[in-house]
Every structure is written in structure tokens, then in C-alpha cells.
Amino acid sequence: MRTRFLLTLILIVLIGGTACNRSSKLAKQSIFMKRATGFAYEVLVVMDKDAWKGEAGRLLYDQLTAPIPGLPQNEPAMRVTYAEPFQFNGLLHYVRNIIHVRIDESLYTKVSVHKEKDRWATGQEVVTLNAPSSQILAEYLEKQGTSLVAWLGEKERERQADYLESSHSVWVNDKVRARFNAQLYAPEEMCSYKDTADFFWVTDHGTRGRIDMVVYSFPYVSGRTFTLDYLVAMRDSVLGEHIQGAFPGSYMTTEKRFTPSYEAISKNGEYC
């Protein structure tokens, strides 16, 4: 029996995703707590001024603002705002992502990391970095700093998934479920679509930050199906057939100047 391999391709901007067996966290948040403020992928760094201007601060800033992989133009992973410790009060306590750096050789003997959710506001993530010196903190960031950026990005995606779980395009989800027996929580702004056998394309026709989402399936024939070259070739074939360009003979394809990222994942304990 042949199984079918289902792919979801999010084009232009990766806005949403699905949450697996996750109850809505939005509904459970306390009504007595202020909601976190700020934009997605924005982080406030609270750090001593000398340390911020030194090696550790520069390294932390460079890691937080490193380009997002896979985009045709450089865009920073996070937008960084800085505050000195004495400025960290009032409304700044409600920023959605906060990195609080404390350097004190009389209190700390090594670098420690403490992560706390909803410290001052709901929907907030606070990371506290403790270190005995700026040099030791810099050495730690050289080895582990990118994992902190990846963690912040993961938390932003979780927030978006939680939001889309409770507020998404019902008709898009219904069509994908009927066609592919899968769920797709797309933004409510989706307005136009193309629906054929084994292929579904939906767009919001946005003039700024347009969102296109494509779902398609094809037969699984061998282990070679899950290689990067095969998946890219299949994607180009499907998009070339279904999404024509503005000029005769043009069509959507993979940009070859940027190597596609590829990662095998498991869902509910199954390879996919």
C-alpha cells in the first residue's frame, strides 16, 4: 500500500503554524495581570552600561540581530532595545521579551541562566543571565549564545500558534481537512484560493507583507523521497504547474542562490 507524503509550504512570510494537542493558553491567562507589550521578535536587554558597550554586550547584540536564515534580504532575528538597570521600571516591566544581565563577582562564581514565564505580565518571557565578570559572560555567549536566540524565536512561534489556534480562518482549515485530512490554522485575512486534486493554495493578496500558503501531497515511493534534492525538485514541479508568474512562461520556483534549509522532524512520535 502506498502512503502519501503531505507537505505544507509557507511562502513569503512564515506567519503561523499549528499546535499539536495544545489547549488554548490564551483562554487560561489571568484577567488580573497586564498583558505583555511590544511587537513580535522584539527584546529588551537590561545590562550595565559598561558591560553593554564591552565585548559581552557587543556579542549579545550581534547574536540577537544575526540575519534570519533563508530570506532573500538580511533581516535581524530580533529587534533589540537597551535599558540600564536604573531605567528598568514602570512600563518596561511589561515588555514581552526581556533579557536581564547581572554581573557581580561577589555574588556569582559562574554563569547561570534563569528563564521565567509571565514574570510581570501575561505572554511574557524573562531570561536572567548571572555572571561573575563580563569576560566569563562573553566566553559563555561564544559557546551558548545562539541557543538563547533560538529559544526566543521558539517562544514567539508558540505565541503565534496559540493565537492562531483560537483565531484562524475556519474555511481554510475546513478545506485542508477535507482535502488532506490535516489541519492548517491560517490567518483570518486569507481571501483567495486555488483548490485542485492534491494541491491547495491560499493568499491574502496583501500589499505589504503578502502571505501565501501552499499545501500539496505526492506519493511516497522510497527513502529517497525525504532527501533535500528530491523535495526541492518536487516542490518546483508542483509550483511550476500551479502558480504561474506575471509574464508568459514564468512560474514560481525555488531561489537557487540561497541554499534551502532542511530538517527532518517527528510529529506525535512519527517521522514526517
Residues covered by each model-derived region:
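Secretory pathway targeting signatures of secreted, lumenal, and periplasmic proteins
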Residues: 25-30, 37, 44-50, 187-244
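N-terminal "mature-domain start" segment
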Residues: 26-42, 50-53, 57, 62-66, ...
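Sec-dependent N-terminal signal peptides
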Residues: 5-14
